[in-house]
Amino acid sequence: MLYSKIMVPYDGSEHAKHALEYAKGLAAISDAKIAIVHVVPSGVMGVDQIGTEGSLDGVPLGMLNYEQYEGVVRAALDQAKEKVTENLAGLVEDIANIVTIDVVAGTAPAEALARYADKNGCDLIVMGRRGLGAIRGMLGSVSFGLLRSTDVPVLTVK
């Protein structure tokens, strides 16, 4: 068996979609599972604002206890997973039996992806060369950061 678990970071970009198609081909010849992983910036969920003025889902940030905050984060991750799953609908129907879709939070996407790969036993990462915000002609910052953050082989796809 060449690979057993291939991780595909997914941000909805064309490069991410191409990476998924490439990973599907690799999975077919190596009988591997595919983990599609989307990173939600933790700042979107108010991580950097806890204990300050303002509110998150109508609850004053200074009054959130751990359980309340955990519930808000879980709801944000669930909502993001729902959107990603909808976005992937036409792309994963043919591999539904070997694919999982996960959403993780992190302040740095590359580090969050590296942690996921290490924690979940991924033996290959197939990702787009550039994401939604990358400058044309350059290796994306997440791709570059992931290369430095993990020992798992990273294959970038145009």
Task: Enumerate the predicted regions with their spans.
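Structural beta-alpha unit
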Residues: 1, 82, 86-125
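Small/aliphatic-rich secondary-structure junction motif
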Residues: 2-66, 93
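Conserved acidic residues
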Residues: 4, 123, 151
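Short, well-ordered secondary-structure micro-motifs
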Residues: 19, 46-49, 111-114, 137-138
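Short secondary-structure boundary segments
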Residues: 38, 128-130, 158
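Short, hinge-like loop/turn segments at secondary-structure boundaries
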Residues: 51-55, 118-119, 143-145
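Short glycine/proline- and acidic residue-enriched helix-loop micro-motifs
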Residues: 61-76, 99
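Glycine-rich, Arg-bearing micro-motifs that act as flexible, cationic patches
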Residues: 124-145
